[in-house]
Amino acid sequence: MSVSGTAGTGKTIVALHRAAHLARTNPQARVLLTRFSEPLANALRAKLRLLLTSEPRLGERIEVYSMDAIGRRLYELNIGKLRIATDAQVSEPIRQASQKVGEHKFSHRFLTTEWEQVVDGWQLDTWEAYRDVNRLGRKTRLREEQRRLLWSIFEIVRLGLRERGLITTSGMLNVLARHYANGAAPPFNFAVVDEAQDASIAQIRFLAAIGSGEPNGLYFAGDLGQRIFQQPFSWKAAGVDVRGRSATLKINYRTSHQIRSQADRLLDPQIADVDGNVEERKGAVSLFNGPKPEIKVCSSIEEETRAVGAWLHSLKADGLQPHEIAIFVRSTAQFDRPKAAAEQEGLRCKVLDERLETAAGSLSVSTMHLAKGLEFRAVAVMACDDEVIPLQARIEMVTEEAELEDVYNTERHLLYVACTRARDYLLVTSTAPASEFLGDLIPQDQLT
């Protein structure tokens, strides 16, 4: 089954309790509790330990891994030695194969995304499979002769990887999916998947293979409005159909009414997936009120530093401790801006890495991509400038219309994720000209 809900509605807590319930009521069962990335899995592991403080033995039958990490472990246990191809070990062969087949109109960027999202994503291993595949989300229409030319490139890449003893992460998960689909005993009786909206095609196929042996063997929790890593694809085509088996959480436990309602302006009231499942974002209710979020467009970086410094000063006056405060930016290129604001107030900064460990006595600084799963009493989202979010470099790399739409959607989702990490206080700042998203976050005539 699938459970959805906007940020702060308790999807992760429900997933944790679901995993514990499955282990408790099925004494011989093994349960996989998973997320799509290692940093998020690390955070989930810590939360499970806290939940099972009085039942530590229960945790022995619940394994917490990222999907790729458990894939690597199972591959080496059941298949053999594993050598995962790096991005460079795939990108350069694509470039070389492209040159080898002669002149054509396709850019290296197009070839790379076609490989990632279609050929490797769906693990197409024959010309016929590539010829007939529905290239969902790829708006560049390809005639059969164009597909044949492209396949000649990708076939060179596939054979080259095989000759070098390399396999992609998608390939690894595909081998495992076939292994279990062909009758091997699944390593888990149940799989509980949190942050499911960012699972890849190969990850969903792998989960479908290991979770098919039990009724309700698979449980997914996620929010399409927080999809920031994956392009949309059909879960049904990948082996998982949740139509008619979904529920939506409506009570927001984390975020004040003022912050939630302001952040909701960034997203449409309804978001549909490729299979036609619709997530209704209306009707969520927060359990408490708080100060109105502040949005400031400053004339310079120095003015922004002073504004955030003054905000930090007011938080200290209200009794907040540094570890209860976080500042998020789009990428590491903007880290100097939160550091300068903290320094103005004499506060130490802890730059979060993939372990997501905060430090007593320090406010946290992080990119928006690492914000998932985190919660702070006060959050500032800095450097929301034009060409920073949405990131101009991503826009310039776009090769087709559908990809541009997805860039805008995921960048908007990033800002939503960052803003909804705040419980009580939210400040969003930029220098002029500001990101176009700020005009959606709050009406233009209310910008300060």
Predicted regions and their residues:
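ATP-hydrolysis module of ASCE/P-loop NTPase motor domains
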Residues: 78-146
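Conserved helicase motor core of SF1/SF2 NTP-dependent helicases
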Residues: 4-32, 36-84, 143-146, 152-166, ...
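Conserved pre-motif I regulatory segment
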Residues: 1
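Short, electropositive alpha-helical surface patch
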Residues: 436-448
